[in-house]
Amino acid sequence: MVSRSLREWLQVLEEDGVLKHVSKEVKLEHELAAVGKKACGTYAVLFDKPTGEHLPQDNQIPVVTGICGNRSMFAKAMGVSVGEMSGRFSEAQAHPVAPVVISSEAAPVKEVVTKQVNLYG
């Protein structure tokens, strides 16, 4: 199954049991990378409450790491087996797909819009 969005891919990882949630506060500066490194290649990790020096105290934006942490995950994201990966990359390079332009009204990136952003914490 080829996922068409990050949300879809996270759902697939959840269903496969390889997405772990960290619901406690984790500091971006050091803790998040340490946890991500420990899970590297085994699990994807979704941090629900990242905190940090440069983030607002009421930050609502989660952080995810390790979503293609090993060849098996990466192959599944591509919709092929591990053995088919190199062939799929070669095929994609030989036959590139043109980008699809979506109107700004229909773009999923506009689902969550914050009007007043404090860039200085």
Task: Name what the model sees in each region.
Residues 1-121:
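Extended, highly charged
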